[in-house]
Amino acid sequence: MVIKKGEIMNEIISLVSLSVIFGAMLSGFATFRLTGMRLMPHFASLMIAFILTLASLFISNNIIGYLAIAFQVITPLTVCPTICNILKTQFQNTGIYSAHLALMGMMFILALGNVILF
């Protein structure tokens, strides 16, 4: 079995993506508790992205890999409509959301890296 350089890099970036998604789940839980059910589609998408990314590390299947990347791209986009409305009306609470939004930005960039390397 020969391991190519691109395969190792793909696994590394997937592992980093997984850690960012896990951190986003933790910071997102606090955000989710504050905003209620308005962020449910985003939180569900985040959990699906976590499960698919974890599965793509253990199962060598292109469909699972591409689904993981797709959800890594979709998840940051699902937070935009809800969080923009919240930040307009509750700007004093922006510190609470900043960690989660930063992780969503990192996740989007890592997903683009996954697209290039996959």
Swiss-Prot record:
Disulfide bonds: none
Coiled coil: none
InterPro entries in the cross-refs: DUF5400
Entry keyword set: Cell membrane, Membrane, Transmembrane, Transmembrane helix
Annotated TM spans: 12-32, 39-59, 63-83, 98-118
Primary location group: membrane
One GO location term (cellular component): plasma membrane
Protein name: Uncharacterized protein MJ0759
Pfam families: DUF5400
Keyword Membrane among record annotations: yes
UniProt keyword Membrane present: yes
Taxonomy, superkingdom: Archaea
Topological relation to the membrane, as annotated: Multi-pass membrane protein
Organism: Methanocaldococcus jannaschii (strain ATCC 43067 / DSM 2661 / JAL-1 / JCM 10045 / NBRC 100440) (Methanococcus jannaschii)
Cellular compartment(s): Cell membrane
